[in-house]
Amino acid sequence: MSPPPPPPIWRQLSFSLLLGSFCIALESAAQGNSATDALNILLIIVDDLRPSLGCYGDKLVRSPNIDQLASHSVLFQNAFAQQAVCAPSRVSFLTGRRPDTTRLYDFNSYWRVHSGNFSTIPQYFKENGYVTMSVGKVFHPGISSNHSDDYPYSWSFPPYHPSSEKYENTKTCKGQDGKLHANLLCPVDVADVPEGTLPDKQSTEEAIRLLEKMKTSASPFFLAVGYHKPHIPFRYPKEFQKLYPLENITLAPDPHVPDSLPPVAYNPWMDIREREDVQALNISVPYGPIPEDFQRKIRQSYFASVSYLDTQVGHVLSALDDLRLAHNTIIAFTSDHGWALGEHGEWAKYSNFDVATRVPLMLYVPGRTAPLPAAGQKLFPYRDPFDPASDWMDAGRHTEDLVELVSLFPTLAGLAGLPVPPRCPIPSFHVELCREGQNLQKHLQLHDLEEEPDLFGNPRELIAYSQYPRPADFPQWNSDKPSLNDIKVMGYSIRTVDYRYTVWVGFDPSEFLANFSDIHAGELYFVDSDPLQDHNVYNDSQHGGLLHSLRP
């Protein structure tokens, strides 16, 4: 028996937006290269990284190596994940399908079994002659990737996981009492932790080893490197804390729960509450708040984790340069979703707000996004975040256009010279190779307008979609990560250059169906007048015309 069709939300909402001149239809095809001039791919995926980076205008965070990459890339200022939680987001952008197609909203199913035998980005490159390799956290481990990181479909070799991963959530954090705890805040002396190393350090070492191996390979490579930090716990070398004195750390600009926020939209950050140092604060559920001094410490450790991550990225990029691979390797850098640092009185991800769904995204294409270096010069020399001289960086190319992570699949294929997978039909459960995202090559302006006019469109017509499930209309213990069978409400969200519109509707998990006549709550925020999304005007009568045009 064929599976039931997916919820019609995106088809219906897109149709409504088309009538209002908000929707764009883009198709593209790419000419294939011969094997001799094929470009390699380095895909760097970070866990829980919001765009708190120097290259995104953050004046506090020290990220000189990522900033350097951005200076040679096209940087997307407005890139959004399709669901702000690890496994669903990664499966979505690695297959090029939205969560309503993968049917993964939690961590407990494998898309090839429960939805469709969908091809992945690395699988497509593997089938086109690439050696595909995975280091660290690329797919989310466990059931959602078949306890194998989708090997052997996606990878030429079994994926590498650092041996020290198993200590991430154990009692390795030294408290003020001198004992070891499983804390949220966990700056460590690396020499004192089990194995004397950390997972991201091991991933960097393995990535460099593989690059050295591929230097002499006759085949092009696709290397995906997944970093853990700044995912909690904030377990990082303690010296990075010195970059962020507490007296320089401010609270979020909007640290309180907005009065107009529907309860269903709030995430009660239960994973943070489980940590021993947070438990000791005896914070009320669901809204808190966390004491202000501890809020500053959380933000300090998040930023310190980002700078630690930056050094690891810097070592990999420097090695790529030293091996003379930077001239023929496309680099894509992104995150699976963002992370709230106290905005709206929320922490972690698990929502449809920009702070949870907006991600960094940059694409480096050798000789096209930036000139190739002269002989003897390096594109990516390692930059020390502790060196003030590392702060200065040339500005790269930026685009303000709204884009989605689900567009990575067609974009990387096109940039590498492979045929761009066709757009998915509706439904597409029976189609192994297709994509629901756009080809972002148009934003890189690497094409001749006369040859491929359909690659270009009005930036104001672009839209980013995201969604998040809830088990109830009010925050409860499993609101952040409900299992499929517990989902009762789905929040579907549209982000345009002008507004974010979210509608929370009834959802039947047994049929994977949303009921758009059963509206539980709504949100409407105007970007220009309310960039932090604190003033929900969904119930204001003056916006009734806009809401009527948006409702399916």
UniProtKB/Swiss-Prot annotation:
Instruction: Show the disulfide pairing.
Output: C173-C186, C424-C434
* Cofactor(s) in the UniProt record: Ca(2+)
The enzyme's first-digit EC class, named in words, is hydrolase
Q: What induces it?
A: By glucose, in a dose dependent manner.
Q: In which tissues is it expressed?
A: Found to be expressed in alpha and beta pancreatic cells.
The propeptide segment or segments lie at 30-35
Q: Which GO terms describe its molecular function?
A: calcium ion binding; iduronate-2-sulfatase activity; sulfuric ester hydrolase activity
- Cofactor detail note: Binds 1 Ca(2+) ion per subunit.
Instruction: List all membrane-crossing ranges.
Output: none
Q: How is it modified after translation?
A: Synthesized as a 75-kDa precursor form in the endoplasmic reticulum (ER), and then processed by proteolytic cleavage through various intermediates to yield a 55-kDa mature form, with the release of an 18 kDa polypeptide.
Q: Which residues bind Ca(2+)?
A: D47, D48, C86, D336, H337
Q: Where is the active site?
A: C86 (nucleophile), H140
Q: Which reaction does it catalyse?
A: Hydrolysis of the 2-sulfate groups of the L-iduronate 2-sulfate units of dermatan sulfate, heparan sulfate and heparin
Give the EC number(s) under which this enzyme is classified: 3.1.6.13
Which Pfam family, just one, is annotated for this protein?
A: Sulfatase
| GO annotation terms (biological process) | dermatan sulfate proteoglycan catabolic process; glycosaminoglycan catabolic process; heparan sulfate proteoglycan catabolic process
The record's keywords, sorted A to Z, are: Calcium, Disulfide bond, Glycoprotein, Hydrolase, Lysosome, Metal-binding, Signal, Zymogen
| Signal sequence range | 1-29
Compartments annotated for it: namely: Lysosome
* Gene Ontology cellular component annotations, sorted alphabetically: lysosomal lumen; lysosome
Q: Which residues carry this modification: 3-oxoalanine (Cys)?
A: C86
UniProt record similarity statement = Belongs to the sulfatase family.
What is its biological role?
Lysosomal enzyme involved in the degradation pathway of dermatan sulfate and heparan sulfate.
What is the designated name of this protein?
Answer: Iduronate 2-sulfatase
This chain's source organism reads Mus musculus (Mouse)
